[in-house]
Amino acid sequence: MADHKAPPPPDHHQDKQTQTPPPRPPPPPLTPRPDSSGPLQNSHNKPKPKDEGTGDGRPAEQDRKKSRGDQGRDTAPGLAPGRSPGLGPLAPPPYPGPGPRRSPRQFGPGPDRDPEDGLQPPLGEGQVEGHPGDGDQPQGHPPPTPSNGHKGEEGDGEEEGAVGGDGNDHPPPPPPPPNVQEGSLLGCVGSLLLKWEDQFNLLVQNIQGDLEDYWTKLSTPQ
């Protein structure tokens, strides 16, 4: 009697391939498009309320524009104080100015100023800085002597504006000493003049001879 083998159990992969997929649900119904002529509605299908206290919403928009325009450069949103909107958030802060002017009396003289400058009195009329006037002569120094050499005393000379009296204070200059070589110098100059005269006469004769030869050549026919 032959042995009958039992059939193998069904494979799970074969069962999944043989199964049919479940049917898909039907698509949802399409909602109709809202009418554009009706009132404006938001996402919750509620009418958009108008601004309170306005009939058509224009005054409220103007108030918003005014509130936006009131914001200055330093109060603009997204900017830190001290930063300008044109430079962006990463721009460095502006360089601080020199600050208020300091009074030299309060803080003393600066490093470049002489401490004695603050003790000098103000300059009078006709005075120049560094040159005191007639009444402000430094102590311990005599007054400067005038250039005429008479200690400030001007005499009445013969000419207008002359200084120093009649002009007899200064002796006349002494005469020059006699030249011992005057005779030899005159003799040398005389010999040179004679030599130049002879050379000049010789040059004139040469020119006259050349001119005569030239005229004779022109007069003879060729």
Curated annotation (Swiss-Prot):
Q: Where is the composition biased (Basic and acidic residues)?
A: 1-16, 48-73
CC annotations in GO: host cell cytoplasm; host cell nucleus
Identify the stretch(es) annotated as Disordered: 1-184
Q: Where in the cell is it found?
A: Host cytoplasm; Host nucleus
Membrane-crossing segments per the record: none
Q: Which UniProt keywords apply?
A: Early protein, Host cytoplasm, Host G2/M cell cycle arrest by virus, Host nucleus, Host-virus interaction, Modulation of host cell cycle by virus, Phosphoprotein
The GO annotation for biological process reads: symbiont-mediated arrest of host cell cycle during G2/M transition
Look up the domain of life of the source: Viruses
Q: PTM details?
A: Phosphorylated by host ERK. The phosphorylation triggers a structural change that enhances keratin binding and protein stability.
Which regions are flagged for Low complexity bias? Answer: 76-89
User: Which segments show compositional bias classed as Pro residues?
Assistant: 20-32, 90-101, 170-179
Q: What does this protein do?
A: Contributes to multiple aspects of the viral life cycle including viral genome amplification, suppression of suprabasal cell differentiation and egress of newly formed virions. Induces host cell cycle arrest at the G2 phase by associating with and preventing the nuclear entry of host CDK1/cyclin B1 complexes. Inhibits cellular DNA replication by preventing loading of host replication licensing proteins MCM2 and MCM7 onto chromatin. Within the cytoplasm, associates with host kinase SRPK1, a splicing factor regulator, and inhibits its activity.
Q: How does it assemble?
A: Assembles into oligomeric complexes. Interacts with host CDK1. Interacts with host SRPK1; this interaction may favor expression of late viral transcripts. Interacts with host cytokeratin components KRT8 and KRT18.
- Hey, which family's this protein in? Belongs to the papillomaviridae E4 protein family.
Query: What else is on record for this protein?
Result: The major E4 form is first synthesized as an E1^E4 fusion protein from spliced E1^E4 transcripts, such that the first few amino acids of the E4 protein are derived from the N terminus of E1.
Q: What is this protein called?
A: Protein E4
Q: Which organism is it from?
A: Human papillomavirus type 8
What is the phylogenetic placement of the source species in the record? Answer: Viruses, Monodnaviria, Shotokuvirae, Cossaviricota, Papovaviricetes
In the UniProt record, the gene name given for this protein reads E4
